[in-house]
Design a protein with these regions (language model features):
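Hydrophobic alpha-helical connector segments
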Residues: 9, 15-51, 99-105, 135
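Amphipathic alpha-helical packing segments from all-alpha helical-bundle domains
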Residues: 29, 40-49, 53-55, 63-89, ...
């Protein structure tokens, strides 16, 4: 189990940190890129089932839960926190509680992993749920909450639909 987690998720944090450090563009563009890359590299793969497994079994295996926390949860939250901090420092994102801001970014990813590995297969045949469209909708929603708001009376910037 540990080897699978390290190979498929935890082992990618060095790569993701480098991508964040070298990214040229706005923090909104970084966020869009991160969601898209996460979906391609984790969410759309069998590795997404690891998170569902941890959701359902972590309380039964404290040592595995601690391992997952150290190898995946803490580095993931730190990476998201750095991205949000970058946006705040550049004046692109409004000031926020970064501890809770990370959960705002994580929640759509967690939902997709749970959906694909549990409720998705139970969907009605005519129900269309496209993960990519869900991600685009969530990005738009999150960015409208994170971005600096124009001063009263100012014209708002155009929507950035990815």
């Amino acid at each position: 189990f540990k080897a699978v987690v390290r190979e498929n998720i935890a082992g990618r944090f060095a790569e993701w940190n480098t991508e964040l450090e070298t990214f040229v563009g706005t923090t909104s563009e970084v966020l869009i890129y991160c969601y898209q890359v996460w979906w391609e590299r984790i969410g759309a793969t069998k590795a997404s089932g690891i998170t569902k497994l941890m959701f359902s079994e972590a309380q039964n295996f404290p040592a595995i839960a601690q391992f997952y926390q150290q190898e995946v949860i803490l580095p993931g939250r730190a990476l998201i926190r750095r991205m949000l901090q970058r946006g705040m420092e550049r004046g692109e994102f409004r000031e926020m509680d970064l501890d809770y801001g990370t959960y705002i970014v994580l929640a759509p990813m967690m939902f997709l992993m749970l959906w694909n590995n549990s409720m998705g297969p139970c969907s009605l045949p005519d129900e269309v749920f496209t993960p990519e469209q869900y991600i685009r909708t969530q990005i738009d929603n999150i960015l409208h909450g994170l971005c600096v708001r124009p001063a009263a009376g100012a014209t708002p910037p155009p929507s950035q639909n990815p």
